[in-house]
A protein has these predicted regions:
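Structural alpha/beta surface segment adjacent to cysteine/selenocysteine redox centers
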Residues: 19-120
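Short active-site neighborhood of thiol/selenol oxidoreductases, capturing the structured segment around
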Residues: 1-12, 17-21, 36-39
Length: 120
C-alpha cells in the first residue's frame, strides 16, 4: 500500500503529525508493506523569500490576533510537540518561503533520503 503525505516543513503541525504517523506505523503489523511517499505542499506560496519577521508577528498580522495571543497559541503548539518528543523554540522561529527547502527534500527523495530530509 502507498501512503502519500502532503506536508509543508514550515508547518509545526506537519512535523507533529509525522511523529504520530511513525508511532502508529511502529505498532502496525503490516507496516513493512507500506510505502510512504512525501509530497511537497506550501501553506503560503506567496510568502516573502527572505525571513523577516517572527512567527508571532506573522500570525498576528495574518490572523488578526495580538502578538501575545499568537505567543500563547505557539506555547500550546510547543507543548503538543513536546508530547511527541520534539523540541520547538517558537520564539526563535521565523517565517520564510519554503519552496527551496521543498526542492532540497525532493532531491533527497531521488536518492532515497526523503524521510531524512523531512527531519532536517
Amino acid at each position: 500500500m502507498q501512503v502519500e503525505i502532503w506536508s509543508d516543513i514550515m508547518c509545526p503541525f506537519c512535523y507533529i503529525g509525522k511523529r504520530r504517523f511513525e508511532k502508529a506505523m511502529a505498532t502496525f503489523e503490516g507496516s513493512a508493506d507500506i510505502e510512504v511517499i512525501w509530497k511537497s505542499y506550501q501553506l503560503d506560496p506567496n510568502q516573502e523569500d527572505v525571513p523577516g519577521k517572527s512567527i508571532n508577528q506573522y500570525l498576528a498580522e495574518r490572523k488578526g490576533w495580538t502578538v501575545d495571543y499568537a505567543r500563547e497559541m505557539n506555547k500550546y503548539v510547543t507543548d503538543m510537540a513536546a508530547g511527541e518528543g520534539l523540541v520547538y523554540d517558537m520564539d526563535r522561529a521565523v517565517v520564510a518561503n519554503s519552496f527551496n527547502a521543498h526542492r532540497i527534500i525532493q532531491m533527497a527523495k531521488a536518492i532515497g533520503k526523503g524521510d531524512l530530509a523531512e527531519e532536517t
